């Protein structure tokens, strides 16, 4: 069962649960990585920056801090954090973890992306 819960979004108070999905497979992988890091306070931060071959790039980092205007999505007890600027580009997206022939990686299925590059790490809106 996939779950998404918006705990707090001061920057976009109208954001409803499910408008940004953090899948159980992504949460399970993040949980494994948190155990490896040995810091139970870590959260996966998703951010969008300018650059990449299509205009914007996705990035992920572990963070044990949250800002007042961050949006926090919790699935299976694991938190995904998105800053206010990045949130506008990923609303409606699904953050997933895929393990396949091309390797293991976090993937963002973003309906807002008008085009993406071949590797899937950059997009345009």
Curated annotation (Swiss-Prot):
Gene3D superfamilies membership: HesB-like domain (2.60.300.12)
Alphabetized GO MF terms: 2 iron, 2 sulfur cluster binding; 4 iron, 4 sulfur cluster binding; iron ion binding
UniProt superkingdom: Bacteria
Annotated cofactor note: Binds 1 iron-sulfur cluster per subunit.
The entry's keywords: Iron, Iron-sulfur, Metal-binding
Known cofactor(s): iron-sulfur cluster
GO biological process: iron-sulfur cluster assembly
Record GO cellular component, one term: cytosol
InterPro entries linked to this entry: FeS_biogenesis, FeS_cluster_insertion, FeS_cluster_insertion_CS, FeS_cluster_insertion_RrpA, HesB-like_dom_sf
Name listed for the protein in its UniProt record: Putative iron-sulfur cluster insertion protein ErpA 2
Source organism: Polaromonas naphthalenivorans (strain CJ2)
Gene: erpA2
